[in-house]
């Protein structure tokens, strides 16, 4: 049988138009990454936080793949442009939505469905032979984002059980869709109706593109300072050391009760770190893209850790979530300096957590907790090592010697505040605390980890 190749040369997009469209797509992928990341700490449901971590990393990877194709098309690798100021205003409007349902509607019923539809149209309309890399890429991105849409629809169905809730969600959706149509969609060229099988585009002229010039709108995302992330009941926060001691016990031995207390406290660190990675992605777009991609990867890791640690507490250790308080360390995440946010959390706390997990693993192998706990500790420790390396490498790269000394001074003050909370009047201070970006490697093995978390 002869091979029949039904593909034909020719498409609706030149190399220049192709790259402009990919730049528009990359802008929206990054906007979605920043929105979900920045909303995470004000979203109470742990299941939503965890899924946001997955989706944030998906959008970051999508943006990175688009950057690779942009470079191949002789365009700037990190180019990401809104088609026009009206589309940027739409994204700003979505960012400022306050309720969880409204945010989910905006992302999973309006923006991502539109993006998937546009990807499919572009893949169908471009040259299938000369532009095969773009076709393959857009089919891949459409599949990833379509999986997000399915999750979002299921969640919205569960959150809008009452008729008035569904009507309100539909009203929000209609308003956003109207704004989307008015601004011309992600490309500014209108909403393509490629799914109408009977409609022929053969005689239609190629869509025109308006040059937005250098005045296209850009906006900065900022999150209001909070005392702690939003969490759903039964989780709660306390700044009273006595409550922590009474719920968890002062001496956490490697027993079933001891491991239960350890992992319940660790869960807070996983939640906070998921939230803080997302917040950094939203608030610091000026950071190098390679660094932001690593931050998104860490957010995904921490989101997985939420699932792992919560499951360990409930299913492996027989505990109830929320039986003990979480600490109030979120004030560090209100710092205007992104490197300060990483200094204590990644370059001190996560380094200490690596040691803690190594000790837990050895104790679990020897005690009743069993090999399952030991294996999980080993996997968690492997992830933490990458998070420590991330911050260490980037602080050394971005901060000169004087700034690193300032980070050490600030970091020691922050560590003293944290350790002093648990140690009380007997605390001797944090003047000898080391951080991993310090030129000696930050080694302070003589100090025992006094805090569980990140």
PLM region spans:
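Non-heme di-metal
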Residues: 2-454
